[in-house]
């Protein structure tokens, strides 16, 4: 049972405004306002809009035939979501926290969330309209890494030492199967977070870490990256060293053959790699324990060549140019498709992997998924860059159908935080053609507002506007979610966003627990839309953000134009707050006009639409009147959002 939360009068007003926006214009009422202690039922949007649904309704019961752009995705790190089995909190490892990695008071250690807990909350996730789950990495990790005083754990899932097993802190392989089957039984998809760039930190370099090393080239200040030019594969130590690996032709695309890599037999071209005693068999599958499958060039600088060949914070960087690594990774992740019937992959550190790897790996995954009866297998890469031109390289050249849309995140943050006018959207959306037809010009890109790396959207807006009230921060955060639901792309909700979480930083600081937290640096955060803290269980289906997401996702689900339709710019303002765009139903030709006021004052506006569109029907907010052919007049409250549908198909777009 979820306790009723006390919220302020202004927060109740915002919630009421959201409900009014969903149904139609708010009208005066003589009824007394409900007390703060009275739980309010969430608006039933599907019922309200049933008469206005497109004739091309989507069958949401069949997750296999549903195309990815029709989904709303919910993302979580399992360790931070729900603890369904406290007996696995230490993963079965003996010793203290530096052995098993469990310390729920420390933001950098395991907290106890697991697959049983996640399975128990599937109806909560589905209730907000999510139809797909992006599951953070669940593989067995090295429990603890880091030097003395800098230790943290692999709770996040990205320090893998067994690519075939579920991390025992999270549960078992059987419990993963139970979770996926339970999601599928609800018509929900599961996208698994995968890593091909690196493994856990096992390999060391004698020049840096071996206390018995006496060589003149002993390193005292970290293992700095050593480049291909200064430390080629064919000499030992540096370019002036003795010849090794005779006949090896390098690792460019046309030399990535088994015959060529068979000549790469000595691996001390840059550093002298070794596996510390006791860790010789630390990784699974067994082939990952062979030093020859890693670059062994030292720490990345995150720039240039080192971003492909360097170790991230000591993590062992896989030689993804090596054909046996390519084949090995293909075999590993085919297994996750076969055994668990995953519906797609989110692919970590995409830009740090050899591009030719993707041209082999991605088609192999699609082909295997189709063979397993998964025709709409959805893969999206992580390329941490807000520049659409940089992102589009991966769809145009490297073979990705989708990449996470960091450009969308940057544009929405700039506008909704007040940094720029709405003309920022012009510059962003004009780049959609760069992505190509594979993404349907951006319509299949996963869009998001914040995540576990960069931090939460609400926290970023607060940092940009330190004096902003909690009520205004809630209104801006709601509006940002509304824009994400109705603009092109596949919306991704980061767990906790729907409960008003406001991180006070990025990475570890933005990975709060949904179940009652014992982490002081989380529990002192001031959440929006509630008086609760992260010290409580935060699965409140009456939270204004949960309700807003549920309401807007219901509208999106009822009208395929809002997921599949072409997006047309209608209005932006330089240094202004108004933004309008249309989505066109690809089957019926109906035009949907979405208008937002991203400002603190009411606005009245005339918006030009297609001359064939007429008699706008209200799906959300107030839709005003047709002033004349092709012009609609609207009034929007502060942070207001309206969604309007033409009653008749446009003559221009009708089929």
Locations of the language-model features?
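Conserved, mostly hydrophobic/aromatic
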Residues: 76, 125, 135, 163, ...
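Active-site clefts of carbohydrate-active enzymes
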Residues: 442-470
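Active-site-proximal helices and loops of the catalytic beta/alpha 8
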Residues: 55-56, 180, 184, 198, ...
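A structural motif
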Residues: 130, 342, 400, 489-490
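Substrate-binding/active-site clefts of carbohydrate-active enzymes
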Residues: 65-71, 79-332, 339-340, 361-365, ...
